[in-house]
Amino acid sequence: RGRFTATCDNGITRVFPKRGLRSGGALIYLHGGAYVYPMVAGQWGIVEGLIDRTGLPVIIPDYPLAPEHTATEAFDFVQPIIDEAQAEFGRVVIFGDSAGGGLALSLAMQRRDADERQVDGLVLYAPWVDVTMTNPCIEEVQPRDKVLRVPGLAWAGRAWAGDLDPADWRISPLYGDPVGLPPMRIFQ
């Protein structure tokens, strides 16, 4: 649309506003898709909105997806991207939607536990924080969700977990410790 410039290299897309670029930070956008689907057109609309509202560049890792890959591979792919963004831009906030929100939360917990430089904030939109799909309330919500179905999500969660237990906090951050995490906003 002419408002942005973008580069793509080694599975990392970087999108910049053509005008009004603010200094002092960047966003990393982790897309949703149940850890099995790539970005879709609507998610590019989210990226546009983030740039329009913040004036910051957005870095979009095309992280490895299940069932061909596992969460561990995605962690190994995204963590260096965070490090590089911090070195280049200083302040880094991760915006994750759905599965990307669960991934963002897991990455922040891992950085905390490894005493690595933490991101400056998390914005989580409807984060998928429990891939076990065992919460009894799911049956109440299921009829209202016309797209996502419990059996398919449970399969995706198991595929994403790989050799890890789906209830492991790195896979389902709901079971992790939130103490010491960066400031976060959660939208449902």
Identify the residue ranges that each predicted region occupies.
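An N-terminal hydrophobic leader/cap segment in hydrolases
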Residues: 1-7
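Alpha/beta-hydrolase superfamily serine-hydrolase fold, recognizing
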Residues: 7-12, 16-188
